[in-house]
Amino acid sequence: MPRSVRNLLLLALPALLGACATGRGPTEVATKDTSKSFNTVVVDAGHGGKDNGAYRRFGGAEKIATLDVAGRVSHKLRESGLKVVMTRSSDVFISLDERVEIENAQTNSVFVSIHFNDSRQRGIHGFETYYHSPNSAELASRIQGKLMTITNSTNRGVHVANFRVLRKAKYPAVLVECGFLSNRMEGGEARDSEYRNQLADRIAEAVVEQRYGSSRRTAKAERKLNQDDTPFLNTD
């Protein structure tokens, strides 16, 4: 082997080993850009079953809040004329690989994963949205922007992340962190039905606008996006 080639391989080896160790290698799936043409939305309620997610006395179990918000988002999106597939519609455990299978089984779709945040520092609060593929960035930014219209919201930004459900998605995919359960104010709000409906309104509105544009939203969607405050899950 020529010395120059050997030297290049030696230089590249640490980076390759690091990528293998962390799982943060290149995108594993070539993502198709359906960010403006999708007719299906896969709505993912984070955690579930034996996996509580974050569990704080202010906000309760994350798996309960995510399921409620995801149910509301799904209802509003269906009213807009979009097809919706939920990764779970009850308190059951769904592995990350199963979630990936569900999202990738759809065609001409986008994926929206609902989560709540957690921190050891109770003062930390705010919304943040994550994406992995470049063609997911616009939807992530749109959702984050809509969440910022909620009173007293704090913008923690839009970030690239290597989460499995984003990294392995065949279509545009985002993950939304709807505030910190560890924060007294946001954790308390996460238990409130009206506040969860606000979260669902903003997320659904962003998805509808991403697909149809703000000027093309149907009258039916306009009426329904801010309607029906009935809880989707009994959290008592």
Regions found by a protein language model. Give the residues of each.
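Catalytic-site microenvironment of enzymes
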Residues: M1-D236
